[in-house]
């Protein structure tokens, strides 16, 4: 299972040439076919529905608002803690996409989960497009993503997570677990 984030590192990869089941985040449907699309933002759900995407996952509290067959509930978190970053409402599409993948498959490949800004600016292939911030905006604080994705890795110790990124990308120390590995994009 390939789980696709929207970091700039994946911008030169032709996702249509990767032939395996895919979970993607938000606007990735604009560029390639995704089997399962995760949208935690209502505007993105509406865009995906307008595009006719057949399988959209969103927050349970919003899925029923759409009353539309392809819109499904995201899975519940395995555990909920007491911190703000443990609250399901504060989980974004990226961490939820990895969680969904872990429920579906025991071998997860991840691409486009760059986390960090570039020159302190937004790091997203869809910057400057509908529903996204300007590429001139400051980088998003990545601490919630690091924490939440680390939770998924620990909740699924029998699942293998292989992250593909550039050679200079630093994997967060919280992700350095026995079931998580890092490889370069050319190995994808």
Language model segments and positions:
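Metal-ion/cofactor- or nucleotide/acyl-coenzyme-handling active-site neighborhoods
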Residues: 1-188
